[in-house]
Structure formats: structure tokens, C-alpha cells
């Protein structure tokens, strides 16, 4: 069935793809109100009442497509009570916030247009919004909606109460087999979902992984992601220690880059540092390209087997995600707990 065009406004005057936040499928859980606070956030129109410089006002066609609802007033910052800061970045800050009417707790990411324009990453931000808004999985941080004013862009995100995986790893140094295997199962399941939707994350690392109330993993930060039907890319991106050989060598790459990344992550969680970490960038590059992989004697054989099967120079030889979650070491050690929304 052909998808109806849904053009939603963008503060830089360019048209988005034929998709939008307002086309998100709605799920009604048993024993819950017909419209949950999260759904109300997604249903809300993000069309703006005043034109952004260089842009004509456009009708948000998707606003009336959901549940037969009428057009709603767009969000403004006045709709939220702002709490403590959750994080700071190059382009803005993230705050704990509460939508006043529903009392629903969210993470509000506030980005400064001037910084985004200065760095020329408008397209990257729009791509992040378009991709993340259409991903609904218990191990992917949900983007509920967005709005903007003259100076800022606001992303309304799911709140992950237990914060960054990176900070927990810093505190503990390493994770045990149970926790690492659980993360591997959660990641493989979430990435299988992404890949089926032709989305490659390309920047899986501890800093981009958050933790929900029950400690469940939440993939965040889709800024480097691509939604490419061809699944063939040739741009350099991601984090140095996590870059796969094909990207360093400038070769075409596909979704197999995410398999390499989770192999590197598994090693770092078990050992405390990435497998190819070196004093210089050039040495790190050299070790990655040669797959100069060295395991400490303390590494469990099952984890070693899994990592070795993921960190292959030839992308086609890497262990498929289906086999990651079914790997004997993962099956024996994973303690995955699905959040209520997934039951």
C-alpha cells in the first residue's frame, strides 16, 4: 500500500522525506488508557504558528491522520517544566523535563541552531530525527516528537533513568559475563530490528547506550545513522576505536559495520578498554586493519569465541546478529529483562 505523503516543517526550509513523526504506529497496551501520555506527545502537531525565516508555512497533513484527531496546537517550551541537566554536548544540553498537562516525564534535548549551522550539520540532525522517530523497540530510546523556535530545536525523548552505560563502566571498570551477555542479546535484537528497517547505526559505543529503569539497554544518538535502501555507504564516521577495517580503508560498507562495533563493545565491557586501543591514531588504525586482536588470559572462552567471530576483516564472515543472540555463551549468561512495554 502506498504511503501517504506527510510533509512536516523543518526549521532550515528544506523538505523532509515522505515520512514524519505523525505517521508513527500507535500501540495501545492492555489495562492502559486508550491514549497514553507518550502517545499524546507523538500525536501533538509539530507545525509552527509562525514562519521560520526563509520558509513558508506548510500544513502538517499527518496531524489529522492519527486516530481521527483534529489539528492540535504545536508544543512550545512553555508546555514543559524543566528540571536538572542530564547531559551537555557540543550543540546543546539535555534536561529532565515534565510535560505540564500529562505530567509525563521526558528528556528534553535542546539544540542551538547557531551551533548546528556553524558546523553545517543540519542534514545530520534531520536524519537523526527522521530515523529515530520511526524506530519503536524496547531497546531503542524513543523520540516522541520535536518542535522549534527562532533560536533552538527541541527533541522530546524517552527518559532513561539509569543514565549512560559508559558511566557505569567507568565506575566498575569491567562488567561480568552475565551483564555483558545480556547487553549483547539486547543489542543484537535491537540492531536486527534496525537492519530490517534498512537502518545502520554505525556508532555503537558505551557513550551512546543508555539504561532504562530496570537496567535494560537503550540505543541512543542516531546522529551517525543512515537510512539507506541500498545499504551502501562510503563516508568515514563513528568513533576511532570502534571503526571497522572497511571504513578505515575507504571501502564501501553496509550493515556489517554494526557487527564489528558490537564485537569491540563486548571486548571493552569484559576487559575495560577497546581491543585495538593504542598510544597513537596511526597505530590504532594499523591494528584494526590487521585485526591485531589479543585476549587477556582472564577472558572466558565463550566470550572469546563470540568476539573472534564478530571481529573479522571480511564483513561477510562476521557472525550474523541472529547467531549472536543464539550464541551458547550469550544463551548461558544473558539475564535479559524486557520492559513492560514489550510484553
UniProtKB/Swiss-Prot annotation:
The phosphorylation of Thr-235 requires the binding to INCENP and occurs by means of an autophosphorylation mechanism. Thr-235 phosphorylation is indispensable for the AURKB kinase activity. Keywords: Acetylation, ATP-binding, Cell cycle, Cell division, Centromere, Chromosome, Cytoplasm, Cytoskeleton, Kinase, Kinetochore, Mitosis, Nucleotide-binding, Nucleus, Phosphoprotein, Serine/threonine-protein kinase, Transferase, Ubl conjugation. The modification N6-acetyllysine is found at residue 218. GO terms for molecular function: ATP binding; histone H3S28 kinase activity; kinase binding; protein kinase activity; protein serine kinase activity; protein serine/threonine kinase activity. Its EC number is 2.7.11.1. It catalyses: L-seryl-[protein] + ATP = O-phospho-L-seryl-[protein] + ADP + H(+); L-threonyl-[protein] + ATP = O-phospho-L-threonyl-[protein] + ADP + H(+). The modification Phosphothreonine is found at residue 235. The active site is at residue 203. Belongs to the protein kinase superfamily. Ser/Thr protein kinase family. Aurora subfamily. This is Aurora kinase B. It comes from Rattus norvegicus (Rat).
Amino acid at each position: 500500500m502506498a504511503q501517504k505523503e506527510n510533509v512536516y516543517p523543518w526549521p532550515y526550509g528544506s523538505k523532509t522525506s515522505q515520512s514524519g513523526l505523525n505517521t508513527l504506529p500507535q500501540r495501545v497496551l492492555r489495562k492502559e488508557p486508550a491514549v497514553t501520555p507518550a502517545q499524546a506527545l507523538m500525536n501533538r502537531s509539530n507545525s509552527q504558528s509562525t514562519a521560520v525565516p526563509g520558509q513558508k508555512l506548510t500544513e502538517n497533513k499527518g496531524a489529522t491522520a492519527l486516530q481521527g484527531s483534529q489539528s492540535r496546537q504545536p508544543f512550545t517550551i512553555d508546555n514543559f517544566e524543566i528540571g536538572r541537566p542530564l547531559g551537555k554536548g557540543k550543540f546543546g544540553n539535555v534536561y529532565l523535563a515534565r510535560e505540564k498537562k500529562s505530567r509525563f516525564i521526558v528528556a528534553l534535548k535542546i539544540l542551538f541552531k547557531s551551533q548546528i549551522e556553524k558546523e553545517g550539520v543540519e542534514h545530520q540532525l534531520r536524519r537523526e530525527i527522521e530515523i529515530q522517530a520511526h524506530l519503536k523497540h524496547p531497546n531503542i530510546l524513543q523520540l516522541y516528537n520535536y518542535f522549534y523556535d527562532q533560536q533552538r530545536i527541541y527533541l522530546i525523548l524517552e527518559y532513561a533513568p539509569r543514565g549512560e552505560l559508559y558511566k557505569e563502566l567507568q565506575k566498575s571498570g569491567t562488567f561480568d559475563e552475565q551483564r555483558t551477555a545480556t547487553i549483547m542479546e539486547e543489542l543484537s535484537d535491537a540492531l536486527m530490528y534496525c537492519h530490517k528497517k534498512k537502518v545502520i547505526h554505525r556508532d555503537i559505543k558505551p557513550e551512546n547506550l543508555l539504561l532504562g529503569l530496570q537496567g535494560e539497554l537503550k540505543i541512543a544518538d542516531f546522529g551517525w545513522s543512515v537510512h539507506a535502501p541500498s545499504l551502501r555507504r562510503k563516508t568515514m564516521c563513528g568513533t576511532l576505536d570502534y571503526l571497522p577495517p572497511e571504513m578505515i580503508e575507504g571501502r564501501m560498507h553496509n550493515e556489517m559495520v554494526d557487527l564489528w562495533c558490537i564485537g569491540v563493545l563486548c571486548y571493552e565491557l569484559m576487559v575495560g578498554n577497546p581491543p585495538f586501543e593504542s598510544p597513537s591514531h596511526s597505530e590504532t588504525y594499523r591494528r584494526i586493519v590487521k585485526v591485531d586482536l589479543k585476549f587477556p588470559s582472564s577472558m572466558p572462552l565463550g566470550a572469546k569465541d563470540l568476539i573472534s567471530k564478530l571481529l573479522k576483516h571480511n564483513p561477510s564472515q562476521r557472525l550474523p546478529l541472529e547467531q549472536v543472540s543464539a550464541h551458547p555463551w550469550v544463551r548461558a549468561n544473558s539475564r535479559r529483562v524486557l520492559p513492560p512495554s514489550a510484553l
